[in-house]
Amino acid sequence: MTATADAAVPAMGRRTFLATMAGVGALGLAACAADPPGGGTLSLTSKLPTAVNPKTSLAISIVTTQLELQASGQIGKLPFKVSSWPNLTAGPDVIEGFRAHSIDVASNAGIPPIQAHSSGVQAKIVAVSTTNKPIYQFATAPGSDVTSAAQFRGKKLAFSQGQAQGVVTLRALKQAGIPYSDVHLVAMTSDEFLTALEARQVDVAVLSQPETTEYINGFGSKGARIIYTNVVDYLEILWSPVEVLEDAAKAAAIGAFIPFWARASIWAWEHPAQWIQTYYVGNQHLTTAQGELIVKAQPKPAFPVSWARAIAWEQQTSDLLAAAGYDPKFDVSVLFDRRFEGIASAAVPAQYRE
């Protein structure tokens, strides 16, 4: 998808998003389909089973966790089988993976579960990690006169509806008191932001490291600048399709996986040099210097004992999207399977709990 001509809000409506998502099936997800349900039927209101059948198999779409577990020597300790580690990370791709029965559990920011609910895909959040540190920055096009978020009014802003960058943009506008009707949200995916900035197709776009530093190194002399705000992308979540959670064996396996996921992220935080080489250099093919920029910008992992704040944050996100005309307003508490609440926080040292 290329940058569109600037258009008044909304740049991409719900129908457009759903039509786009429906075309993601070309990814060939069927080739890595998750195993069919193998346990007894479990009601979503029933107590979560804890006994894990070692023959239970999950398709886990979290490649970072796979690499963390491998590097830390923990992957062989999983008490269940992993049928595949699909490399799907973007929200629309994961949602289509759920629809195609190809993924049992995935990791995303807070916005994809809202999009899934709006598209009729039933899924639940089963674990939460939080951050209070901004990891995204706003970058201006070369020669732009924008120096603060208060000056976004009347400007063209790159906007990805189904990704965390989109929510960061909406939150920044709300914080600055700028109505959506006073800006031009230009629909594109986040991997197009950098090119759109360089070509002056947009005035402002959300970037993260290492793109932020590399962009300023290349275009700072031409008038590009970084605008820092205190807007955070608060949530990282694990989530699963409802049909998976209604399988007793798979629900138990997911409950057992959550502590591994939480401790794996802590391992990466505590072993930055090894993680840079394992993931950013070895898997993402970045340089060590680029990996160092990313790791330096990352927040310390935190796992909330209570999900109350996470639910409130998710509700705010849903309300922002509804106000912008992208999704209908609803009570987001239905997205959280609170039987899993506390599993992650109980599995980590106290300094990593929130």
Predicted stretch roles:
Residues 45-49, 55-100, 117-119, 167-174:
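Short, polar/charged alpha-helical segment
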Residues 73-76, 91-104, 118-120, 150-151, ...:
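Short helices/loops that flank or line small-molecule/ion binding pockets
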Residues 111, 192-282:
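Pocket-lining segment of extracytoplasmic ligand-binding domains
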Residues 319-354:
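Conserved C-terminal helix/tail region of periplasmic/extracytoplasmic solute-binding proteins
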